[in-house]
Structure formats: structure tokens, C-alpha cells
């Protein structure tokens, strides 16, 4: 389990590093996005991953790695947007955005480590393509919950699905780690 934690921390640092760089380039321009738009951005990235897996090639010089990082970072953005609501302007500082990023990533990590313990790292035996299918399933669920104005009868809400997308996306499993860049 210690190796798993170190591997997850490495992947998380890659995602955060890119988030920081894009935050410096673009500011918190994503603050104008409504949660439904964030969900659609994640959907686009997951569909591209499935397309690359199915076709076995990509015509754009960005592979699966960048899409997985995007899913993680948009998942965090989604959690921030659910917490703060969307805005008509970039209404938070870089520091505040990073504080919120770290807060939601920490909450997600704690849940991920608990689930990893309970499931005894069963995810390490999963096929890579199953991750993509799980991500797409979570997105479909999220869209349905959004279409129902966030109301569910027995299921968790949009926030729980965003969190699940975060720990389903880039895993340190052999083969999956190679999908992540060694540097951002």
C-alpha cells in the first residue's frame, strides 16, 4: 500500500502542476462555467480516450495522458463550482483557487485510500479500457442527476460523482501509469 500511496501522490503532483501552470496562463477563467459545462468538458475528454483506445491512434499530438490529467483537473473545478457556484467573472485569486484545489484533492485522496484498503487494490487487476468505461458511466450518471436538478432518490449527488471521476481517472496501476506524463 505504501507504493500505491507514493504512486498516487506522484500522479496527483503532475495534475496539480499543470493546474498551477494553466491558472497562471489563464487565471480562473473556468469560474464562468456552470457545473453542467464542466461535466460536458469531462465527457469530451473521456470520449476522446475511448476513441483513441478503439481506433488505436490519435491524429492530434496529445495522447490519453493529457486527457486523464484534464479529467482530474476538471473534476476538481467541478467540485469548486458546486461549492462556490459559477460566476460571471474571475472572482477568485490564484491562491484561493489553489487552496480549494488542495482541499478537494485531499478529501478525494482520503476516500481513495480508504476504498483502496477495503477493495484490497482490486483495481490493479482491471483492464485499462474498463477505466474509460467507468469514467463514461459516471459522466452519464452525473448528466442524469444534473438533468434532474440535482435530485436523487437513493444515489449520491453530482459532487460524489466528480470525486469518483478523480480517483477513477489516472491510476498508478502498471500500464496506467504509462498513460501519465513524467512531467507536466
Predicted regions and their residues:
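Intrinsic disorder/low-complexity detector
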Residues: 1-33, 82-128
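Charged, amphipathic alpha-helical oligomerization/scaffolding segments
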Residues: 14, 41, 70, 100-103, ...
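Short, contiguous, well-structured surface segments enriched in hydrophobic/aromatic residues
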Residues: 16-60, 64, 123-154, 158
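Hydrophobic alpha-helical segments, chiefly the membrane-spanning helices
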Residues: 180-184
Amino acid at each position: 500500500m505504501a507504493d500505491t500511496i507514493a504512486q498516487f501522490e506522484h500522479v496527483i503532483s503532475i495534475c496539480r502542476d499543470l493546474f498551477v501552470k494553466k491558472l497562471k496562463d489563464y487565471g480562473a477563467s473556468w469560474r464562468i462555467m456552470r457545473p453542467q459545462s464542466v461535466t460536458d468538458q469531462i465527457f469530451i475528454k473521456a470520449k476522446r480516450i475511448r476513441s483513441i483506445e478503439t481506433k488505436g491512434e490519435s491524429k492530434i499530438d496529445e495522447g490519453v495522458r493529457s486527457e486523464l490529467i484534464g479529467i482530474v483537473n476538471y473534476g476538481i473545478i467541478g467540485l469548486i463550482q458546486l461549492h462556490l457556484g459559477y460566476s460571471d467573472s474571475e472572482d477568485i485569486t490564484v491562491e484561493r483557487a489553489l487552496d480549494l484545489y488542495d482541499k478537494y484533492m485531499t478529501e478525494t485522496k482520503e476516500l481513495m485510500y480508504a476504498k483502496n484498503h477495503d477493495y484490497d487494490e482490486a483495481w490493479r487487476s482491471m483492464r485499462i479500457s474498463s477505466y474509460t468505461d467507468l469514467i463514461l458511466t459516471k459522466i452519464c450518471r452525473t448528466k442524469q442527476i444534473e438533468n434532474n436538478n440535482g435530485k436523487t432518490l437513493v444515489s449520491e449527488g453530482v459532487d460524489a460523482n466528480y470525486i469518483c471521476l478523480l480517483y477513477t481517472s489516472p491510476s498508478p496501476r502498471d500500464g496506467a501509469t504509462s498513460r501519465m506524463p513524467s512531467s507536466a
